[in-house]
Amino acid sequence: MTSALCSKSTAPHTLSDDVADLSHSNTMALACTANSVVTLKNEAQLDEFMANYGQDTQYSQPLFVLSGGSNVLLPAKLNAIVLRPQMRGIQVTSQTDSHVDIEVMAGENWHDLVLHTVAQGWYGLENLALIPGLTGAAPIQNIGAYGVQLEDCLQYVRAYHFPSQTWHDLTAVDCEFGYRDSIFKRQPNTWLISRVGFRLHTDATKVLASYGDVQTVAQGYAMKQSRTKPTPADVMHAIIDIRQQKLPDPKQLPNCGSFFQNPIIPQDQFTALQSSYPAIVGYPMPDAMIKVAAGWLIEQAGLKGGGIEPIVTHQQQALVLTNHTPYQATQKEVAAAQQYITDTVYERFAIPLSREPVWVNADGSIGYDKHVV
């Protein structure tokens, strides 16, 4: 984990056509090649690239920003210039007795960042442990888990705006965060995030461990250390344990994490479903809405471990789609499995499921679901 920000500028490196293979650059391990790939080590390299963009036939193709590849579904052929932000560094920008402000470059691995902050005694991100991907992609989805969302700790985002070719510092309000949503997600290929600012607290007694099995597992960690209450580190380790038990490692079994969003439905619809399915899992939301566990819906529809080969749901977590033929399966096969699952769930519960990972079209533009809650 680096501790100082990169500042030296070197020319961005462009890969030639015959090596622009992105099959190993997406955690779903879908077969994909791109016209060219540009690796960005610092912000100056992007400025340099954009100064040439559009002025030469080599730079006349659409742009597509690819971070860690953990939340995307890539096409077999991507007819675009792929920009890969790989800026590295973590820097403390301000610190008091109660909090610390840090600035993290986009290329830092997210889980490594969580481990680093907890080890330093900086808290707030521990519930987001073991989420795959890089820090620069985290604001796009407003990643969340176990009662915490990224926006809870985020102060600002430094991002390049392609239409105006200018840099912007966006506050959390400017980012227009929602459930797994942000301005960056709604305006795809418009922004490239280079760094993210967080405010973390230093109170080791302040934890959020009431979600699911976290409290029980975290309390077990605390008791082993003769503590009466779990610390943020206990919560982090508990969540790591739980996620490792429920979610497959993409390096062992390719996947892109939770494939379907938990749908949000009206309270009266949820109450009606409860009469037929008393065990249905739901969580209260504002405005008399209920967030329903998509994994439960898929499992109750008889699809745990089901799908259309080689894309099937995971045996331990129906919310996750896995790829049984790494680097060979294509986006079209994912589409077939997704359609089968969403149609089956809708026929049984009349609840539409929305895909969480980003669907990338052949020209680098973003595709959207027909089912939206």
Curated annotation (Swiss-Prot):
Signal peptide: none annotated. Its cofactor is FAD. The active site is at R180, S258, E356. SUPFAM superfamilies: FAD-binding/transporter-associated domain-like, Uridine diphospho-N-Acetylenolpyruvylglucosamine reductase, MurB, C-terminal domain. Keywords: Cell cycle, Cell division, Cell shape, Cell wall biogenesis/degradation, Cytoplasm, FAD, Flavoprotein, NADP, Oxidoreductase, Peptidoglycan synthesis. GO terms for cellular component: cytosol. One of its GO terms (biological process) is cell wall organization. HAMAP family: MurB. Cell wall formation. This is UDP-N-acetylenolpyruvoylglucosamine reductase. It comes from Psychrobacter arcticus (strain DSM 17307 / VKM B-2377 / 273-4).
